[in-house]
């Protein structure tokens, strides 16, 4: 277990996460600590466990073992008969999840709601923010991600992928989270739209947002993160400062990955 003093400095402490599907162990003890303002990029080949690890942080995937501490508060778990973790207090998890906003690879906007409805839905129904206040804030966040006021009444199907992902980022910001989790936020986008989303993410990093980003964008990992983790076959093979990890890789696997042979 983590010492209290250690967790207080941390916005997020993830300890020794294990996850398996049947006999296939996809995470073999992965840990991460994020202090306020950290931008941590998680890189690795397909199947290395990056997205599974990210989804275990907010229990979208249930880890088989490990501990997650958000802003000094450990997610309460118990062990079931099979020796796997179960959530012990669903109300607590719900509350902790409001501190962890997730931005998905495929945007996950509600198709039947227009842009502003997508952004205000959770603040109104989960946080209890009055509608007018939620809408005012939503407009601020939409402006922050570079979307014009005329977009707010449009439906997701009428927007480009880049616009949809920026709405998804505005929706995450509207929850005023402690930590933002990004699961390959640009990999479903056409190449010419990637830049507009990365620009928004860079702006958030410069504002001091705490961000955990699973990404294939090495430029972002190098220039925006202050820490990079390289996952290989469910373990952290190498981690550290971007300049060290990406410019002077020590492990053969990371050298191969960066040269493109594992991509």
Language model features with spans:
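Conserved ABC ATPase "signature" region
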Residues: 73-78, 82-87, 131-150
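ABC ATPase "signature
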Residues: 239-240
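Conserved ABC ATPase signature
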Residues: 155-159, 163
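Conserved catalytic motifs of ABC-family nucleotide-binding domains
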Residues: 176
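Catalytic Walker B motif of ABC-type/P-loop ATPase nucleotide-binding domains
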Residues: 180-183
């Amino acid at each position: 277990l983590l010492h209290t003093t250690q967790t207080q400095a941390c916005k997020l402490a993830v300890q020794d996460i294990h996850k398996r599907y049947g006999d296939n162990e996809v995470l073999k003890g992965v840990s991460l600590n994020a202090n306020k303002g950290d931008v941590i990029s998680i890189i690795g080949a397909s199947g290395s466990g990056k997205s599974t690890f990210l989804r275990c942080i907010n229990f979208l995937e249930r880890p088989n073992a490990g501990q997650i501490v958000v802003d000094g508060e450990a997610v309460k778990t118990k062990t079931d008969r099979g020796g796997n973790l179960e959530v012990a207090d669903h109300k607590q998890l719900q509350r902790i999840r409001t501190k962890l906003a997730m931005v998905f690879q495929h945007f996950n906007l509600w198709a039947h709601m227009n842009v502003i409805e997508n952004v205000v839905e959770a603040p109104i129904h989960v946080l209890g923010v009055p509608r007018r206040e939620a809408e005012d804030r939503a407009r601020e966040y939409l402006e922050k991600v570079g979307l014009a006021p005329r977009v707010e009444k449009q439906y997701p199907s009428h927007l480009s992928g880049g616009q949809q992902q920026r709405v998804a980022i505005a929706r995450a910001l509207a929850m005023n989270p402690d930590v933002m989790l990004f699961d390959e936020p640009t990999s479903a986008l056409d190449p010419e739209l990637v830049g507009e989303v990365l620009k928004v993410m860079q702006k958030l990093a410069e504002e001091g947002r705490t961000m955990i980003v699973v990404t294939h964008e090495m430029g972002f990992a190098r220039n925006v993160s202050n820490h990079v983790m390289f996952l290989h076959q469910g373990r952290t093979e190498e981690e550290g400062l971007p300049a060290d990890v990406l410019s002077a890789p020590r492990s053969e696997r990371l050298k191969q990955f960066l040269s493109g042979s594992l991509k």
